């Protein structure tokens, strides 16, 4: 496979798994006051995508394909559940210029988002019921769920990762490690190609003076050959002229001899 195709495929893989880079999203979320809006928009679009996939899985006639699609839906839901937890932290965070009513409105948005996420069918009814009970039930009214708006910092153990999310994180780290190893191999190959190209350029630079010298010698030989041909042509013309003159003298003598013989014979 050409190196350029490998580079394009690596870029596509990096773009495909970029949204799973939790550290990157964490840095983006902490970079500005509008981190909540960005994360909310990202989660909302991901929920729409996973909902479409769940609908496809529900209409899939191939059982194996449906199971695989449901497994992917569950993994995505686990990842989005972690993002919802982050969104919840951002919702209760005090920001300059943000009123208490606006923070409460953000909390309501988080609750609605969590309800939408847990309502997505994933082929695991027991897991869905358990998840709904953990969130207070998908059908429970939002007013029964309260946020402690005075709690600014929460302990690290307040939010626990689920087993599925931990497995997905391990799988993601393993895939990213393999991709990094592949990228390192590609980088080494590119360095080798770069060194080879540099060596070829050096050899070509060394051959340039030799080629110029050869061209000079060929031009000199061509000029000498042309001059030799001109001189040879002149010699041939001169030889031909001298030979013709001698033949003419001989013929004239023969004719005069014949005429003299005839004249003497007649007398």
Swiss-Prot record:
Disulfide bonds: none annotated. One of its GO terms (cellular component) is membrane. It is found in: Membrane. One of its GO terms (biological process) is intracellular protein transport. The chain crosses the membrane at residues 245-265. Residues 266-267 are vesicular. It is a single-pass type IV membrane protein. One of its GO terms (molecular function) is SNAP receptor activity. Belongs to the syntaxin family. Vesicle trafficking protein that functions in the secretory pathway. This is Syntaxin-72. The lineage of its organism: Eukaryota, Viridiplantae, Streptophyta, Embryophyta, Tracheophyta.
């Amino acid at each position: 496979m050409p190196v350029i195709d490998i580079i394009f495929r690596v870029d596509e893989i990096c773009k495909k798994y970029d949204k799973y880079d939790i550290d990157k999203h964490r840095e983006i979320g902490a970079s500005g006051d509008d981190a909540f809006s960005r994360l909310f928009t990202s989660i909302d679009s991901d929920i729409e995508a996973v909902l479409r996939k769940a609908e496809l899985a529900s209409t899939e006639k191939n059982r194996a394909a449906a199971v695989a699609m449901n497994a992917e839906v569950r993994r995505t839901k686990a990842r989005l559940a972690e993002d919802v937890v982050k969104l919840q932290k951002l919702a209760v965070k005090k920001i300059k210029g943000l009123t208490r009513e606006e923070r409460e409105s953000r909390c309501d948005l988080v609750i609605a988002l969590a309800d939408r996420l847990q309502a997505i069918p994933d082929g695991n009814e027991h897991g869905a019921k358990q998840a709904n009970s953990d969130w207070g039930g998908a059908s429970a009214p939002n007013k029964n769920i309260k946020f402690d708006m005075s709690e600014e910092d929460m302990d690290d153990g307040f939010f626990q990762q689920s087993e599925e999310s931990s497995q997905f994180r391990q799988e993601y780290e393993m895939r990213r490690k393999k991709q990094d190893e592949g990228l390192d191999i590609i980088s080494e190959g590119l360095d080798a190609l770069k060194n080879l190209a540099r060596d070829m350029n050096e050899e070509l630079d060394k051959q340039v003076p030799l080629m110029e010298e050869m061209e000079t010698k060929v031009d000199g030989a061509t000029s000498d050959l042309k001059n030799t041909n001109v001189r040879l042509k002149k010699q041939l013309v001169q030889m031909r002229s001298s030979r013709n003159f001698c033949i003419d003298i001989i013929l004239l003598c023969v004719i005069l001899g014949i005429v003299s013989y005839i004249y003497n014979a007649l007398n």
